[in-house]
């Protein structure tokens, strides 16, 4: 025990332990300083984060406030030691133990003081940071209070709208906080002043119409103060810059839910590989800044009755003007908009976006991009109308509210029952497949008009000159109205020579033919010329009748009719329109139509008087003829028609409207008369080879003496001529018979056989009535036969002869066709051509045979007339003579004639068959000869080759 106590109390051991403690003190100090550095570094990091938040929250610090200046210069301790600067690396000062212990107090006391100083420095930095945060909060509250005071002051002074307020997202300096105009390649749009009703889908639908969108973001409010503002901002990033520029240009200043949009460029954002998909359909309320047009970006939304209850009550907003929907004047553009609306309702927003991407730059789809145009308003109304179940022809016409808070929508009126011509005029505004919208039609400049007039003055029938003038017209198709006006004026001048007029007509034909070219507004030429061609033909009619030379008149007639036929072949106009132009050109002067130049005031006074006098005389003659045959009734019926219907008929039939009601009625009567006359000419050409005993002079009836009806335009009830006009019934019956004879058309042989049986029944019935009907009908028929002015042939005899001839011709043609097919001919066109030639030959043979038999028939008719006269005298003396003898003699004569015709037809048929056999034999012999020659030629070649 004593030894141990000595060991513990040994002075050397105490000295060693003291030295050890001195060595441990610097180590302990270093460890404490490292702990202090570890404590300070998180606070420095946290302070940097708060400074960044201060920048984001737009906190401004007064640079003159030195009290808040942090201790960044470093502090010196009482003993002169310096503390390193904030944020710099700490390097502790190390002094050896002997130097550190020199001239100083007790070591334990100094260590405690240093530790206290370090603890005081640590708490001081934290306190400074907390105080700095408190001061920043006070500054923020003071700024918000000043802003509220300024708002109250402005509201007291002037009643400014919410659009005059500066958004909270602007700095006090006036610069948008998130705008970045430095990068010209950014596609990110910064949208300010959005309503609280707007969400991401709304922005995607609204801005998606301009192009594919990469991302949409709305900065939703977080604090109660931000929520009280009821508006916020957002970002819309497009996939390309061009779409963003278009959206910025079109949507700038647009009012959305009563908030005016302010759009600028934002910072560049990352673009994904694929754009956002199309959103589901919804509803929007957008209108332009003026408040006159409401704009829908969503096109396939459900009906308005599907809107939630909070928006179901549509209340009219005061001081908001009504929105009037105007239907586009261009029928083609209207049709495109209607079709687009129907397809968008089926395909949704994706279909509309696809059309907008492909149709960008196409004038036909400008209504999708011009949100303030009346075409876009019509498009939006069409979408809503179709969604409500309306159709293209019927819709709601009373005003209604489509969106809560907007004005009333006034739909366009329902289309009236308009004539097709009115539709043509409205469709005439369409030009070359492109919409002209509502811009006014262009006109030629003075130099262009003078150039075109010089071309027309020097125009001849040379192709180069006509081609040059036609090229000028197409190059200036935008001024089609003035070009047509100049051409029409030049074609209706009375002083123009015939070759020049014909050349100008050829120019009109070339322009109309090229109106389908892919030139803007070129198609307007056809529509505008359609309105002026009737007047041009009226002028050509005056020119045609004023020509004295027969050859010149015939050449003019041939040229004009060729042009009209070419138009008919090109299907440029309807057949009725072409027929009207042709009838106008060929109309004679005795139809009561005043000449074109007399109506326009171009004719001299003497000529006018002469024309008026001739017209009055012709009117008297035509009135007498009309009273005789019922034309006056038709004319009177037309005179009672309204003027609008007469104009419609004239436009449809290519007739001029000049001269008023009387002239239009006269032109319509002349047109119908010309159509009937053309029908007679066609029938005469078909029947002149079949009726050898009848010529045009025998069966011709004056066209002006026939009843006129307008069955082509409107079916009218027939006029009973016998009840209205005292005409003897036998003459009327004879006229009807002759008309029947004249209107025989070639039909099928099966129909002819049916007709034959019917006619035989009628014949037996008529013979029975003759036998039992009394004397009055017989004497009337005999009087008709005795009258040389009315040449009537027995109807049954003519019908039987005609049917027999046609039957034999058909049989011969069938046999001839079979013979051609047996010969190996397979070309159907060649067979038809030969059959047609053979038909003409057979008809010509029948005509010559009929002409040979004609004198015999005339002698028989004269004998029958003499016998009828003798029979009449004998009947006056002796009434007891029986009528069956007359019928028997008629039947005998008819049977004799039928036998003759039968034998003659049989002989002719046999003769034709012999001819065909001979021709066949000749052709076969020729073929054999050709074959023999070819074989001999081959043999010769072989022999030469062998040699």
Swiss-Prot record:
Residues 12-34 have a biased composition (Basic residues). Residues 1-35, 63-167, 412-434, 752-797, 846-947 are annotated as: Disordered. Residues 1-11, 66-84, 104-155, 854-876, 888-916, 924-947 have a biased composition (Basic and acidic residues). GO terms for biological process: mRNA processing; RNA splicing. One of its GO terms (cellular component) is nucleus. Expressed in leaves, inflorescence stems, roots, flower buds, open flowers and siliques. SURP motif repeats lie at residues 336-379. SMART domains: cwf21, RPR, RRM, SWAP. Residues 187-268 form the RRM domain. Keywords: mRNA processing, mRNA splicing, RNA-binding. SUPFAM superfamilies: ENTH/VHS domain (SSF48464), RNA-binding domain, RBD (SSF54928), Surp module (SWAP domain) (SSF109905). Residues 444-589 form the CID domain. Disruption phenotype: No photomorphogenic phenotype. One of its GO terms (molecular function) is RNA binding. Probable SR-like splicing factor. This is Protein RRC1-like. It comes from Arabidopsis thaliana (Mouse-ear cress). The lineage of its organism: Eukaryota, Viridiplantae, Streptophyta, Embryophyta, Tracheophyta.
């Amino acid at each position: 025990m004593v030894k141990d106590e000595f060991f513990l109390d040994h002075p050397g051991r105490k000295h060693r332990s003291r030295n050890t403690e001195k060595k441990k003190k610097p180590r302990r100090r270093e460890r404490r300083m490292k702990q202090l550095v570890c404590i300070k570094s998180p606070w420095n990091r946290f302070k940097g984060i708060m400074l960044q938040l201060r920048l984001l929250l737009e906190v401004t610090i007064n640079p003159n406030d030195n009290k808040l200046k942090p201790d960044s210069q470093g502090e010196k301790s009482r003993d002169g030691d310096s503390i390193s600067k904030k944020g710099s690396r700490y390097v502790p000062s190390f002094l050896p133990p002997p130097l550190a212990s020199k001239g100083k107090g007790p070591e334990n006391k100094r260590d405690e003081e240093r530790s206290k100083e370090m603890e005081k420095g640590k708490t001081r930095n934290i306190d400074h940071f907390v105080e700095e945060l408190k001061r920043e909060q006070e500054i923020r509250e003071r700024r918000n209070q000043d802003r509220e005071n300024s708002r109250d002051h402005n509201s007291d002074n002037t009643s400014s709208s919410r659009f005059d307020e500066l958004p909270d997202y602007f700095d006090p300096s006036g610069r948008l906080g998130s705008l970045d105009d430095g990068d010209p390649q950014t596609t990110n749009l910064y949208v300010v002043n959005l309503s609280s009703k707007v969400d991401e889908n709304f922005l995607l639908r609204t801005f998606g119409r301009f192009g594919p969108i990469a991302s949409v973001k709305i900065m939703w409010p977080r604090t109660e103060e931000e929520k009280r503002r009821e508006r916020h901002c957002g970002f819309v990033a497009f996939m390309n810059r061009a779409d963003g520029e278009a959206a910025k240009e079109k949507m700038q200043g647009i009012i959305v839910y009563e908030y005016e949009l302010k759009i600028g460029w934002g910072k560049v954002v990352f673009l994904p590989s694929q754009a956002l998909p199309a959103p589901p359909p919804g509803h929007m309320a957008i209108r332009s800044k003026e408040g006159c047009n409401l704009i829908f970006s969503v096109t396939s939304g459900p009906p308005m009755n599907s809107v939630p209850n909070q928006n179901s009550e549509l209340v009219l907003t005061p001081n908001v003007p009504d929105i009037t929907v105007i239907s586009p004047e261009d029928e083609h553009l209207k049709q495109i908009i209607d079709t687009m609306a129907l397809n968008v309702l089926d395909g949704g927003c994706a279909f509309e976006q696809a059309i907008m991407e492909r149709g960008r730059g196409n004038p036909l789809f400008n209504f999708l991009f011009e949100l303030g145009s009346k075409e876009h308003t019509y498009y939006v109304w069409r979408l809503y109308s179709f969604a409500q179940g309306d159709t293209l022809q019927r819709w709601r016409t009373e005003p209604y509210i489509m969106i809560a808070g907007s004005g009333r929508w006034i739909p366009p009126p329902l289309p009236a029952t308009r004539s097709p011509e009115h539709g043509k005029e409205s469709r005439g505004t369409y030009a070359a497949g492109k919409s002209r919208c509502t811009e006014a039609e262009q006109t030629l400049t003075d130099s262009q008009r003078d150039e075109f007039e010089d071309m027309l003055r020097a125009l001849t029938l040379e192709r180069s000159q006509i081609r040059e003038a036609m090229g000028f017209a197409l190059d200036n198709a935008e001024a089609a109205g003035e070009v047509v006006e100049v051409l029409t004026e030049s074609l209706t001048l009375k002083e123009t020579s015939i070759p020049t007029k014909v050349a100008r007509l050829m120019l009109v034909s070339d322009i109309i033919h090229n109106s389908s070219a892919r030139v803007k507004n070129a198609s307007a030429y056809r529509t505008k010329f359609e309105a002026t061609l009737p007047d041009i033909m009226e002028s050509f009619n005056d020119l045609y009748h004023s020509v004295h030379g027969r050859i010149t008149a015939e050449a003019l007639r041939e040229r004009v009719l060729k042009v009209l036929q070419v138009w008919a072949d090109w299907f440029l106009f309807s057949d009725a329109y072409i027929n009207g132009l042709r009838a106008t050109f060929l109309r004679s002067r005795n139809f009561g139509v005043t000449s074109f130049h007399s109506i326009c005031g171009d004719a001299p006074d003497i000529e006018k008087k002469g024309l008026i006098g001739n017209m009055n005389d012709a009117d008297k003659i035509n009135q007498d003829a009309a009273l005789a045959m019922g034309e006056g009734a038709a004319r009177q019926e037309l005179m009672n028609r309204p003027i609008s219907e007469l104009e419609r008929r004239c436009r449809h039939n290519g007739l001029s409207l000049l001269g008023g009601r009387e002239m239009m009625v006269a032109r319509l009567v002349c047109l119908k008369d010309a159509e009937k006359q053309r029908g007679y000419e066609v029938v005469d050409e078909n029947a002149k080879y079949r009726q050898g005993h009848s010529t045009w002079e025998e069966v011709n009836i004056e066209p002006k003496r026939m009843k006129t009806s307008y069955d082509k335009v409107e079916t009218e009830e027939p006029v009973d001529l016998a009840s209205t006009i005292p005409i003897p019934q036998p003459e009327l019956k004879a006229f009807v018979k002759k008309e029947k004879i004249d209107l025989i058309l070639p039909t099928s042989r099966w129909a002819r056989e049916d007709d034959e049986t019917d006619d035989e029944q009628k014949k037996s019935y008529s013979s029975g009535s003759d036998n039992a009907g009394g004397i009055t009908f017989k004497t009337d028929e005999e009087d008709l036969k005795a009258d040389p002015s009315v040449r009537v042939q027995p109807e049954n005899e003519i019908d039987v002869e005609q049917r027999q001839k046609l039957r034999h011709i058909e049989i011969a043609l069938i046999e001839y066709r079979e013979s051609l097919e047996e010969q190996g001919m397979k070309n159907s066109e060649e067979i038809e051509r030969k059959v047609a030639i053979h038909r003409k030959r057979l008809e010509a043979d029948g005509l010559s045979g009929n002409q040979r038999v004609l004198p015999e028939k005339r002698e028989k008719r004269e004998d029958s007339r003499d016998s009828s006269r003798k029979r009449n005298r004998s009947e006056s003396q002796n009434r007891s003579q029986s009528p069956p003898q007359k019928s028997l003699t008629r039947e005998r004569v008819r049977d004799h004639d039928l036998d003759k015709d039968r034998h003659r037809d049989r002989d002719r048929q046999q003769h034709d068959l012999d001819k065909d056999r001979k021709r066949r034999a000749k052709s076969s012999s020729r073929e054999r000869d050709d074959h023999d020659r070819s074989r001999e030629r081959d043999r010769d070649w072989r022999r030469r080759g062998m040699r």
